[in-house]
Amino acid sequence: MAKYDLAIIGSGPGGYNTAIRASQWGLKTLCVEKDGYLGGTCLHVGCIPTKVLLHHAEIYDTFKRAKEFGIDVKEFSLNWPATLARKEAVVNKHAKGIEFLFRKNKVDKMQGWGKWAGPGRVTVEKDGQVTEIEATHIMFGTGSAARSLPGVEIDGKTILSNIEILQLPAVPKTLVIVGAGAVGVEFASVFNSFGTQVTVLEMLPRITPIEDEEISGELEKALKKKGIQIFTEAKVDSVKKDAQGATVSFTDKTGKSQSVSAEKVLMAVGRRPLTDNLGLEKSQVKLERGFVHTGPYMETAEPRLYAIGDIVAGMPQLAHAASMEGITCVAKITGKQIMPPLEKTRIPNCTYCEPQVASIGLTERAAREAGYAVKTGKFPFIGNSKATILGHHEGFIKVVSDEATAELLGVHIIGPLATEIVAESVAALQLEATVDDLMSTVHAHPTVWEAMADAVAAVRGLSINA
């Protein structure tokens, strides 16, 4: 029987990053993956291929505006097969990259279905053959799958999940998206750019409901301006397929019954944890609706059994959260680095629609509900010279701070390069920086990023460019 210090079930961002760091810190590590490739949902049917399409949409939109930049383009068109081919090339490049990194860092891998088989034991089943592994520590990072609504079956042809919409043979003329979280608005943005008539149905009062209310409102306004039809407080009653596609019937916010027909329907209503048939029901692990309860260092109620990523109760289902959860856990196991437990409010949210949205920390409402005396500052990108140069000056940065101490509580961005320029704010909150700390930080000019200097100054009523 093979023996390891750590066996990780799942090779998504959480699994593979943790496996490499564990090996770097001296643990003999095995990564078990049910599929024939490493990287998980994020790399193959999630974050990475979606961002390829979003970048292609951005380029396509730039061609539409070429005349504004003094460039005459007489004719251009979207080559969808070539777009899909590049998407696959990007995915394959990075899948091979993980294989290389495993070899470089001496991480063993094994394909098959991994299960907990008792303290210190894992079984891996493939093609009817079962291999037993002994491991001092066992970690599950098995990820999640798309949810649907009761009575609505994802058939992969007309009613789609995030997997099938990435592999469509042609760009649909019409598309209904059920759900307006990150997945919903990103695909709405992509296909709107490519000429699809898009309708978004959201059950809650606003789109991107985890974001600050002002950000959600600004994004809805921007998407509607692009021609995307959005219904909030829309309760889907049924999705019925027909020869032309499907018809989605829903009750709108006034109580009126409405329907919209489209070639394709994307279900973007959240994700369910993949914790069935892992042997966890035989352990002391506490499960709630399939999610695993963990302690501050991702430990479960079963000794030396850990959980990370989308299966963890109460934590965001984000690739970068999974990675840091695993690394923090391994730091604790090995004692190689002192790392504090991962805090939910220190995990950035990034949504790559157009305009982009990014945030870190508490929203204004959450800060007030937490009892803070809140002071905010806001700076519009229309006052930023680099944003004007780029031709993308919609949106703003909003800073939420504690009036008593000036500590940064949250930063919320909608606008150009939001998912990149949020990085300063992530570091600032991690270091418990204040408004004054960032006001005394030199921001390079001209950059989109320097808008942050004006946003924090706005908290003091001292913004220069607005």
Feature annotation, model-predicted:
Residues 1-12, 171-178:
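Beta1/beta-strand and adjacent pyrophosphate-binding region of the FAD-binding site
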Residues 1-4, 20-27, 33-171, 199, ...:
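Glycine-rich flavin
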Residues 9-14, 18-35, 41, 48, ...:
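Flexible, glycine-rich terminal cap/loop adjacent to redox cofactors
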